């Protein structure tokens, strides 16, 4: 059993594995940047105003808005 959360809930320096992406809208765009089930993601930093947040995804740093990060279910 795992303790699922969202990508948005990760603290700076924390890592997690992607479980699934909810919603149909931009799921393809998120998959194109490497957010697919099984991918390890690490939260690197948040902008001073709170968003976007930078994540390390498959060796590349990507910035995601909170609304996108909330759609990504992860497990520690």
What name fits each language-model region?
Residues 1-76:
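Compact, glycine-rich, soluble single-domain proteins
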């Amino acid at each position: 059993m795992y303790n699922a959360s969202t990508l948005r809930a990760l603290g700076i320096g924390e890592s997690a594995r992607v479980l699934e992406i909810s919603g149909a809208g931009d799921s393809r765009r998120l998959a194109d940047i490497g957010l697919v089930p099984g991918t390890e993601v690490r939260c690197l930093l948040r902008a001073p105003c709170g968003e976007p947040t930078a994540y390390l995804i498959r060796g590349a740093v990507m910035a995601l808005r909170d609304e996108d990060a909330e759609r990504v279910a992860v497990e520690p």
